[in-house]
Amino acid sequence: MTDNTRLRIAMQKSGRLSDDSRELLARCGIKINLHTQRLIAMAENMPIDILRVRDDDIPGLVMDGVVDLGIIGENVLEEELLNRRAQGEDPRYFTLRRLDFGGCRLSLATPVDEAWDGPLSLNGKRIATSYPHLLKRYLDQKGISFKSCLLNGSVEVAPRAGLADAICDLVSTGATLEANGLREVEVIYRSKACLIQRDGEMEESKQQLIDKLLTRIQGVIQARESKYIMMHAPTDRLDEVIALLPGAERPTILPLAGDQQRVAMHMVSSETLFWETMEKLKALGASSILVLPIEKMME
């Protein structure tokens, strides 16, 4: 990490965002061996170093200028931002873009056998959480006083252990809450992964590499959200067919040999294609409908 000409990116070593971050970098064409236990991994084909750390260390590494970029959950980023502001600091960074993975929600949960009449039910209660600043901001806005019980793991066991009356924790399916006799009652923050950049002057070569990386990330995300569609469509109902398939551009229309009533239609659709949509296309007279994934995309 002593070569300042190389772009330094921090990502989670293991956990919820690790696999998705690896896949994103790979699909952007960055060749890195991330299967070892090394803290630092060097790209084989670009001047990029990957620093693999705990997720809650990533915001600080970016804010302190130790690394150039970080892939991090917005919940962790916002918690660290509030923490530093509470200590009188003025943390600086740029959010380059939101990513299409790492979705979760930070929610309040209470024992299933307790009545819930809104956030006021928590007035004067003790709440266990790993996100004390996000929790405080939310309940302060509601004018609710509470006592915080800071836990760095296994937050969901706090009520049964007598440590707290309720919890504030990340929720995905709710199965863990249910297994511990809890129910989700209020979402206080919704989060996805994001790409952030340190504040301060950036070397021109690094900035050019960041711009290239952003273009590739945009292409990867667009490809994931799009499908390449081919079909035969009746010429007298083309407008209705196109209306069912919002796309980045107008479709390509090709004549069919020996068929004046239909054409071949090719297009990239930004709309997730459900069975219902395909059934509507068929009802309009479309046939030979093919829906294909897109590996890479650049407009």
Curated annotation (Swiss-Prot):
InterPro entries: ATP-PRT_HisG_long (IPR020621), ATP_PRibTrfase_cat (IPR013820), ATP_PRibTrfase_CS (IPR018198), ATP_PRibTrfase_HisG (IPR001348), HisG_C (IPR013115), N-reg_PII-like_a/b (IPR011322), N-reg_PII/ATP_PRibTrfase_C (IPR015867). GO terms for cellular component: cytoplasm. Keywords: Amino-acid biosynthesis, ATP-binding, Cytoplasm, Glycosyltransferase, Histidine biosynthesis, Magnesium, Metal-binding, Nucleotide-binding, Transferase. Feedback inhibited by histidine. Its cofactor is Mg(2+). It is found in: Cytoplasm. Pathway: Amino-acid biosynthesis; L-histidine biosynthesis; L-histidine from 5-phospho-alpha-D-ribose 1-diphosphate: step 1/9. GO terms for biological process: L-histidine biosynthetic process. Belongs to the ATP phosphoribosyltransferase family. Long subfamily. Equilibrium between an active dimeric form, an inactive hexameric form and higher aggregates. Interconversion between the various forms is largely reversible and is influenced by the natural substrates and inhibitors of the enzyme. HAMAP family: HisG_Long. Catalyzes the condensation of ATP and 5-phosphoribose 1-diphosphate to form N'-(5'-phosphoribosyl)-ATP (PR-ATP). Has a crucial role in the pathway because the rate of histidine biosynthesis seems to be controlled primarily by regulation of HisG enzymatic activity. This is ATP phosphoribosyltransferase. It comes from Escherichia fergusonii (strain ATCC 35469 / DSM 13698 / CCUG 18766 / IAM 14443 / JCM 21226 / LMG 7866 / NBRC 102419 / NCTC 12128 / CDC 0568-73).
